[in-house]
Every structure is written in C-alpha cells, then in structure tokens.
C-alpha cells in the first residue's frame, strides 16, 4: 500500500520525468533486452537495435501507461485494467518480466535524475512499480 508520503514522492519524481517518459521507457526496454535477453522473445517482430523506432514507440507506450498510473494511483486496477487484460490474455507475457522492466526503469531513472533519486524516492518508486506489476499480473490467476 502506498503511503501519502510515497504518493507525494512518486508525483514529484514523475513531474521531473515529464516529457522524457517515452525516452526513459525506451531506454529501460533496451536495458531489459540487453540484461535479460529472454525478454526479447515477446518482440520477435521488432527491430531491437539501439534507437529503433519500434523500441521508441513501445517505450512511449510504457511511459504513457506509467503516467496514467501515476495520475490514478488511488485506482490502479481501474486505470490498468485494459493493459492487464492485454498482457494476460492476448500477449501472455510471463509475469516475471514486469519485475525485470521495473528494475530497468529504476536504473534508468537513477541515471537521469541523480539529484532527485534519493533513497526515499527510490523506495517509493519501487513500491509503486511493484504495485503496478501486481495489478498487471492480477488477471493471470
């Protein structure tokens, strides 16, 4: 459960992300593909090379979805219901991949926001991404 302090931290961090959400999403995906090569199996139709338009496009989707989740932190299941359905029923993504992408997102944010990425912000973002992951895998059961 996200505390009021967590919510404040998450909103403050996401305000710093701002218009870079898509770029950071794409960078996190690239990190995930490089660090965890098995995740590439879900993107056989993508050009996974550095800076590819397809990775950038999917990174924007990731960034937009997270922005939507930040805006609806008090109703993550409602805000992410369609994405949960898509990943569980159509794409059939292994739930562990959400944790891997979350880790890569944290690394990416730490690289781009070193002054703002305090231990408290890190902890709040980690809890938030874990909550998002939990919602995304909720339809698997």
Swiss-Prot record:
SUPFAM superfamilies: Globin-like (SSF46458). Red blood cells. PROSITE patterns: GLOBIN. O2 binds at residue 58. One of its GO terms (cellular component) is blood microparticle. Belongs to the globin family. This is Hemoglobin subunit alpha.
């Amino acid at each position: 459960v996200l505390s009021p302090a967590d919510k404040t931290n998450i909103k403050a961090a996401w305000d710093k992300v701002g218009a870079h959400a898509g770029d950071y999403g794409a960078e996190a995906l690239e990190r995930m593909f490089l660090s965890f090569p098995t995740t590439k199996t879900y993107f056989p139709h993508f050009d996974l090379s550095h800076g590819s338009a397809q990775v950038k496009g999917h990174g924007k989707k990731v960034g937009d979805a997270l922005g939507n989740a930040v805006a609806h932190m008090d109703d993550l299941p409602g805000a992410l219901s369609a994405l949960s359905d898509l990943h569980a029923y159509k794409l059939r993504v292994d739930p562990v991949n959400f944790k891997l992408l979350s880790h890569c997102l944290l690394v990416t944010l730490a690289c781009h926001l070193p002054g703002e990425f305090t231990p408290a912000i890190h902890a709040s973002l980690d809890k938030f991404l874990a909550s998002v992951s939990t919602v995304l895998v909720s339809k698997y059961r």
